Every structure is written in C-alpha cells, then in structure tokens.
Amino acid sequence: MACSVCSANVEKKLQSLEGINSASVSLASRTALVDYNPDIISLEDMKREISNAGYDLVIENDRSVEEINRREFTLLRRRTLASWLFAILTMCFSMGWISLGMEQNMISDGVASAHHSSSFANQICLLLALANLLYCGKQFYVSAWKQLLHHTANMDSLVALSTLIAFLFSTFNTFFGEMVWGARGIEWHTYFDASVMIITFVLTGRCLEEKAKDSTASSIRQLMGMQPKTARLVTYEKIEGTNDYKMEEVPISTIQIGDMIEVRAGEKIPVDGVVTQAESFMTPDAAYVDEAMISGEPTPAMKKAGDNVLAGTIPSQGKLRMRAKQIGENTALAHIIRMVQEAQGSKAPVQRIVDKAALIFVPAVAAIALITFLIWWLIGGNAALPQAILSAVAVLVIACPCAMGLATPTALMVGIGKAAQKQILIKDASALENLHKINALVIDKTGTLTIPNQNIDFTKQEDLDLETRETLKPHAQEAMKQLQERGIEVYMMSGDKEEAAHYWAEKAGIKHYQSKVLPGDKQALVKKLQNEGKQVAMVGDGINDTQALALANVSMAIGKGTDVAMDVAQITLMSDDLLALPEAVKLSQKTVHMIWQNLFWAFIYNIICIPLAAGALHIFGIDFQITPMWASALMAFSSVSVVLNSLRLKLA
C-alpha cells in the first residue's frame, strides 16, 4: 500500500464482501483486522478478492510476514541506490558535465556542433531515464495500471502520471524539438533529469519512511523477543544410575500441554505452566522469577511447587521445572502481543475522516494539475506550453496523501507501543484518543484502590474504631492527586458502610465517594455523570464492575482482576501500581497532541505547496515556482517528517 487511498480502498473492498462483519486496514502497520464468518467466506476468498482489486493480501499463517517485509525493503533499497546512479548520470549528461568526447567528431560549424552534441546528450539521457522508469519506477506504473483498471487512483498514480508526462514530452523534444519549437522561435528543453529525480526522491522518501515506521513497531518486536525459540523438555528416559530424567532441546512449537519443562536462571520461560519443582541457593524449595515485563513488578516473585508461571518471564535465581498449561497463541504473552497488534492496527475516529478525504484527494489533485496546465497554456499560448507541462507535473508530484494517511496511525502505533512498555495494554485506538477527554473517573475501592492486608489493622478516626483487612495500594494517594491536578474528578465506589467509605476516601485524597454501593449503583453513577456532560472513565477489577465498564466512555481494568472485567475493558493495567492511571492519561494527551500536529503539517503542506508548484506567485509578480525535481524532494520529506515526528513520543 502506497498511501491512505490504498488502505481506504482495501478496507472498502473488504467491507463490501459478504460474510465480513467489520474490517479495519492500517497504512502504518500494513495490516488488516477482519471480523468474519468462516462459514460464509474463507481467507483464500479474501485473498483472491483483494488481489483482484490490485493489492496483495498475505495471510500470516502462510509465511513469515517479517521475512516478506525484509525482502521487500531490500528490493526497495536496491532500486533506490540504482535510481540515484541513474539520476547522477542523467544530471551529468544534461548539464554537459560528461560529453564522451563526441564534440571532437562533430562537424566544424559551431552552432551545428552544439546542436548535435546536445542531441546526443539528450539521447543518452533518454536511455538512462527509460532504464530508471522500467527498473526503479516499475512499481509505480504497475500499481497505477491496477488502480486504473479498478477506476481508482492513489499516490503511485500521481507519480506514474507526472514522470510519464515529463519523459514523453522530453522524448518528443529530443527528436522533434528543433523542428516544432525551434522553427517557431520558441526555446525548448528536455526534462529527463526531472523524471529521473522524481522517482529517485520518492524512492528515497519511502526508504526513510519504512525505516522510521519500523521504529514505531519496536515495542512489538520487544514483546516478541520475550518468546524463546526453544525449550528444554524433560523426557521420560531416565539417566542411568540416577532418578533424574534426560532432557532434550526442542523447538517451542513442538511443546504440548502436559509436557515437563526445565528452565534455568537467566533463561526465558517458554510457555505458561505450573511449577512442579523449584530450588535456589536462597530457598531450597523455591525459585525467584522476574515478571517485570509482564506485571511491572520490579521485585522477582518467589515461585514454589503449585504456583503459576508465565511465558516470557525469567528465573533470576535458581531453576524450576514446570508442566505446560497454555501453549502457542493461548499464553498470556501471546494474548498481550495480539492485543497490542490489534490496537496498533485499529483506527481512531479522526482517521476515518482522513480516509474519506483521501479518497477524493487524488482526483482533486489531478483536476488541479489539468486546470494549471490549461491556465498557463491559454494565457501564454504555445510559447508557454513547456511551462504549462512542467507546472502540471510539479502539482502532480508535490501533492502528498501519504503524509495525511500516516499522521494518525504512526502516532497511535508509537503511543500504544509506549503504553505496552509501561504495562498499560490498550485494546483499541479510540480508547487512547478518548482518554485525554475524560474529566471524571469512577474507581472501585476493593481490589482496585486497596489490597488485602494479612494483618488486622485497628484505625481510630473521630472516636470510631475501624477493623480492616485492607490497605491502600502503593502510590494510590499520589495517583489520585495527579489525576485531580489534571482536572479529573475522582469518585470512589465502595460497598462498605459510610464510616469506612469516608475513611478510605479521605486516606486516598478523594473528595467524592459513595458507600453501601450495589453493582447497579456504579452503572447509575456513570450514567448520571454522563448526563451532566462529563466524559467518564471507569476503573474496576470484578464481575460486578462490568456493567459500569461497558457504559463508560473509557473503561479500565486491573490486570490481576477477573477475566470478565478485562474482556469488557478497553484498557488493562497489568501492574498494581495506580500511577499507571495518570500515566495513561498523560500518554493519551501526548499522542492526541501528536496526531493533530501531524495532521496540521500534512494539510498545511498541501495547502501551501500545491499553489506554489502551480506557479500561483506569478499572479503577484513574484517569479518563483517549485520545479518538479524539488517538488518530489518536498513530497518525500513531508511523509518522512510525519513519521519522525511521531517517533518523538518514544521520548515521552
């Protein structure tokens, strides 16, 4: 996919197929998320339909997507380097820096010699430009032809049309320029260098863009890097003279549920399972496992026989044996990776508006280019024909729907990836976009704001003795303070009596609270706040929170809560540290700010540059116009700058 027009076309095609309930296509990640009925339509059917529409659909199970992307980037880089070689040679010949000594063989007349030398240089430039078009620019013409067959157009269509016009006009001038223009006293030129440089700059831009986009997906690669390739399988064959069993290094894909696996200190646990045996120098019957990448907890967790362990976590001290419980795509790590991938591939509401604009963008640019050509030609006559053609070509080249298409998804990919690194799992892009709007947060007390306390704590407040087995979670007070400093009103919901609820609210620094709360009361409060015009986030961890979670504008669940709550929630906090709440809001605000920055740049670029390429300043007597060559450089820069700007979120 070359631009947002492509992703919009693919999405539109998928949504039109019978059996597909919903489809979302991301330009930045080049992925499609499809909810479909396999009884009505198969993956092969989708593949065929997308192929008929002019695009290639790669089914992840067929072959390695990463390998395909690597191979495509290698080809892109090779064509870019070749295009630069053609561009340098073309510039040298067109500028007269290389003559191959042909002037020595020309006839003695100075004018005729100059004419023949120029004609020879033009012919060499023609061959170089043709080779560049056929090899380096092949993808643009193939894509443009496919789009034409389906009555659509994309960024490749603009590149193909502009370079073809420049090449054909230059070819005509090479053989007939003196006869047609020279005889009428009209100065003529060839523009092979422009057609070559357009392709060179566009390919260079795409190379830089792909490298930058690859950086936006670093969080996924980091998560995938937590999955080991092999596992140490405990066989049923005993070691001679001992009661222990032999072990065999096997690919992780061969592990079955129930298999016994040994993991030593520093190695990654390959699958989810239950510890059957553990030992370390500190504790003879336990090992210590680093779960920071999953739960965010900095202190290694002690694991004894009967405890659960998760794929991707690492025994920092000791070794353990475990029985495989969940394998492959069913592990917690695989679920996290899948959730992040789906979130990065989902679309924010603003992106759907941009996609609609992109569908009319290319036809609109083509119309502007035609109008530009006609105005120059009608005002200047035949003498202005070269200028009219160059102006139209510059308009076609400088227009950039790519920047518009990349503005939102690249920022979302980085933002969602950054959140995952902080143990904040975002289920869809709309949640990240909406989170910055919230001005009210409803939070459940038990299990969310507080955790069980093993010791009975007698607390005296206002001559009231409270016996409690709970304590505030670490940093709960600071988290509530930061939320309220951001203008978010916090409402605590508790099933406790008034006195206890008041105590916990005061201790956490929360001004609003409700006591003796029933499950329906949480939903009622969310509805009441929404009726008051507030954007409400709900944070909970239990089954009795699901109704309120489903109703809230943004729903958040604690990762150690129930699966039901996490399924309903749009955002899951894997850590018990409530500072993740203000951190999520802060990240949402920065991501949305970055999206609007990108969109502003993408639109303002087109609004300013298209008239400049058309020569609008000549109306005011200013002799300045962007040439096709520089138009291609600016177009490439606009796309790359949007992606690089999104990458600044990594520093947030």
Predicted regions and their residues:
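Soluble-to-membrane junctions at the N-terminal ends of transmembrane alpha-helices
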Residues: 66-86, 123, 143-166, 337-369, ...
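Conserved ATP-binding TGD loop and adjacent catalytic N/P-domain core of P-type ATPases
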Residues: 8, 29, 426, 436, ...
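Membrane-embedded alpha-helical bundles of multi-pass transporters
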Residues: 99-119, 149, 168, 418, ...
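Conserved cytosolic catalytic loops of P-type ATPases
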Residues: 17-40, 44, 189-192, 222-330, ...
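Transmembrane helix-loop-helix hairpins at the membrane interface
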Residues: 75-230, 356, 626
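Membrane-water interface of transmembrane alpha-helices in multipass transporters/channels
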Residues: 119-126, 154-158, 178-198, 353, ...
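Conserved catalytic phosphorylation-site environment of P-type ATPases
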Residues: 390, 400-465, 529, 548, ...
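Flexible metal-binding regulatory segments at protein termini and peripheral loops
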Residues: 1-121, 237-245, 334, 338-346, ...
